[in-house]
Amino acid sequence: AQYRIGDADLNSLQYNIIRSHSCGAGEALPDICVRAAMLARLQTFLNAKSGVHPDVVRILADFLNNEIYPLVPRHGSVGASGDLLQLAHIALALIGEAEVSFRGETVPAAEAMAACGITPLRLRIRDGLALTNGTAVMTGIGLVNLAQARRLLGWAVKASVMLNEIVESYDDFMAGALNEYKLHAGQIEIARQMRAICATSRRLRKREAELYSGDTGAAPTFRHKVQPYYSLRCIPQILGPVLETISQAEKILVEEFNAVDDNPVVDPAAGTIYHGGNFHGDYVSLEMDKLKIAVTKMTMLAERQLNYLFHDRINETLPPFVNLGKLGLNYGLQAAQLSLIHISEPTRRTPIS
């Protein structure tokens, strides 16, 4: 940061920045993550605070529209200086010097560009640094993670309702008033979603009809458990915080996606160039740490619910391990539970790794 570069070398510097930083390691990121990263970088440039040539914007759009995705190694970024290495691999493809994923195959970038009538980018002053400096990769991956987490949450809510229907639980655990007493918006919303899903269900029991009608009989025990197991009854309290975590992550990631995450930042209106740290990735990384914990909570809930479903002495409804064949001869889903435990255990042990 102390060396003065002569005007004659400024364009060469842009190429050197990209080539020297294209040294990531590991497997390539999925195409969807690379696409999200490229879109995030394009959005940054559209803020017109990076000082790049319009050709940079055009070629990023051309790559996206033609579904050309640079091969980007997954290891190398630490976030403190943005996604330098991963973004350099994207930039290397834009100048036609890398491999890309194109139409289901890995081909040289120049070959894919020629097939689509795209001319390799000629770098000008500022272009190389702007292409490599920012949080586009972590933001793009974060948005993909967010979409998947929202999908998982939707499945978790539906599966929880179905499980309660299978064992004919009482429905008051999802009552509007009960969950509003807790005040948390996420819990209230999950309970509302559950009520909407089972609005026409005939499988759930009404507590007032069975316990408060005065017709409970003289037996020492009730026919059905007064309070179902936690994995059935505490769904709003478990998935409510998950929903709020996802919503907060979405807020931060959308802000980051639309932000100017470059450095330096060029402000033509003020006639000023700011040197700062907008490339720093803590906003995204902290939200991803929290999102991983939330996803772990969903896996733990699913494992406990399946454990309940598989054990006839607990659910008092289904055969052991949902074995619909001949006991002893058939095994049902017994082995599946072992697989579930194995899959969920690492996430419980290291939920933010």
Model-predicted regions and their roles:
Residues 140, 176-180, 234, 275-276, ...:
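Short beta-alpha connecting loops at secondary-structure transitions
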Residues 2-35:
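Residues that scaffold, gate, or flank divalent-cation-dependent active/transport sites
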Residues 164-300:
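Accessory "access/gating" subregions that flank catalytic or transport cores
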Residues 8-12, 32, 51-58, 82-85, ...:
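Conserved active-site and cofactor/substrate-binding residues in soluble primary-metabolism enzymes
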Residues 88-90, 296-340:
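Small-residue-enriched alpha-helical segments and adjacent helix-cap loops
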